[in-house]
């Protein structure tokens, strides 16, 4: 029987620090087939092109990064775009600015999934709307994955408890809120990641005065399934 500590480590894994020779620091959180990396890239630093068997998706949280996937390079500013590097497609980055860049990268290799991407590997904002009154969300969508940026209003704003068939991963990128998965509650602060498997009950509430912001990833898309189906049909 799992203890409370075991459950917390399952849903909210303790991040492990990885330090690279070029000064990049990454905090790695893993559950099953998926790794979340919170990366800090120093000014004027190169991340050399590399490739691996996992698909990798990511976006910039703070600052500006010159990101290259395959033979395509694009400047990525905070929360304005996302990238997908399919398995074995080279990808690298450079921080050309005088400021540290903070980025989120997610690596995943799960049996039965097909990892498609746009021809140029980058996703623009698909839509922004209110998911609930006062809760604005922004979406990036590909046929197998959906990224949702969400603002949870302060003073009691909440995402009511629910469950669904989608796997869901989230990272706090601003403010704070309480996140509960299957009765296990954690105070989310900047960089905290959670992992929620299909049909696991979960919800969130922001008890602070300031709004909070989070990045939420769904496998497969939850809110824009029609968009995903159109992309899938186009690929076939």
UniProtKB/Swiss-Prot annotation:
Its EC number is 5.3.3.19. A divalent metal cation 1 binds at residues 50, 52, 56, 91. Its cofactor is Fe(2+); Co(2+). It comes from the Bacteria. Pathway: Antibiotic biosynthesis; bacilysin biosynthesis. GO terms for cellular component: cytoplasm. Disulfide bonds: none annotated. Its main location: cytoplasm. Substrate binds at residue 223. One of its GO terms (molecular function) is cobalt ion binding. It catalyses: 3-[(4R)-4-hydroxycyclohexa-1,5-dien-1-yl]-2-oxopropanoate = 3-[(1E,4R)-4-hydroxycyclohex-2-en-1-ylidene]pyruvate. This is H2HPP isomerase. The lineage of its organism: Bacteria, Bacillati, Bacillota, Bacilli, Bacillales.
């Amino acid at each position: 029987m799992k203890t409370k500590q075991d459950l917390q480590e399952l849903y909210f894994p303790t991040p492990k620090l990885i330090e690279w020779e070029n000064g990049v620091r990454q905090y790695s959180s893993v559950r099953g087939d998926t790794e979340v990396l919170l990366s800090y890239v120093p000014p004027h630093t190169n991340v050399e092109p590399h490739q691996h068997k996992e698909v990798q998706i990511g976006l910039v949280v703070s600052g500006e990064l010159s990101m290259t996937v395959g033979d395509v390079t694009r400047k990525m500013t905070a929360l304005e775009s996302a990238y997908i590097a399919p398995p074995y497609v080279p990808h690298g980055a450079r921080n050309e600015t005088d400021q540290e860049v903070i980025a989120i990268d997610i690596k995943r290799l799960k049996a039965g999934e097909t990892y498609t991407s746009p021809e140029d590997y980058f996703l623009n904002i698909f839509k922004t709307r209110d998911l609930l009154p006062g809760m604005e969300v922004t979406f990036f969508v590909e046929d197998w994955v959906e990224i949702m940026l969400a603002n949870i209003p302060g003073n009691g704003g909440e995402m009511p408890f629910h469950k669904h068939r989608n796997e869901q991963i989230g990272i706090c990128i601003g403010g704070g809120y309480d996140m509960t998965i299957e009765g296990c509650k954690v105070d989310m602060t900047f960089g905290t990641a959670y992992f929620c498997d299909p049909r696991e009950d979960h919800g969130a509430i922001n008890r602070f005065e300031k709004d909070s912001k989070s990045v939420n990833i769904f496998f497969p898309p939850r809110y824009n399934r029609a968009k995903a189906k159109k992309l899938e049909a186009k690929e076939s």
